[in-house]
């Protein structure tokens, strides 16, 4: 009987999580997170809370995942709406890749996101410019 991690099943479950508590529940005690704007931290609930504050409707699809017994790499597409004040919502889409390591219980011990932070920034700037122009 194999004890190998079922990464496809993990990916589908990950796609369904909603909110900071659900994201934090993926992690083992002391599990760490890092991305291009967040240095390594164990406060993964805050990471999710901060993301929700910027993109309340954030949704992430795992496009492809590969891994071993205690690690995986996945490519993803995230979509959301950025809303500044009373202005119109600006839809964004971004792509990235994530490297995760898990413990024997399948809980994340290390999560590192790789993404181009200019991708959503450019989309937001373009959306704001269009709104100012009346379009």
Question: Model features per residue range: what roles?
Answer:
Residues 4, 13, 18-71:
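A solvent-exposed, acidic/Ser-Thr-rich amphipathic alpha-helical stretch
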Residues 49-135:
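A beta-strand edge to alpha-helix "cap/lid" segment located at domain peripheries
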């Amino acid at each position: 009987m194999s004890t190998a991690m079922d990464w496809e099943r993990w990916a589908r479950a990950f796609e369904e999580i909603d909110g900071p508590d659900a994201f934090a529940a993926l992690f083992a005690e002391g599990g760490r997170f890092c991305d291009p704007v967040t240095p390594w931290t164990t406060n993964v609930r805050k990471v999710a809370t901060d993301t929700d504050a910027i993109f309340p409707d954030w949704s992430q699809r795992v496009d492809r995942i590969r891994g071993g017994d205690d690690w995986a790499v996945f490519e993803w597409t995230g979509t959301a709406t950025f809303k500044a004040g009373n202005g119109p919502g600006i839809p964004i889409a971004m792509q990235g890749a994530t490297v995760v390591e898990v413990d024997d219980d399948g809980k994340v011990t290390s999560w590192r996101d790789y993404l181009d932070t200019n991708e959503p920034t450019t989309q937001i700037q373009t959306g704001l410019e269009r709104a100012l122009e009346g379009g």
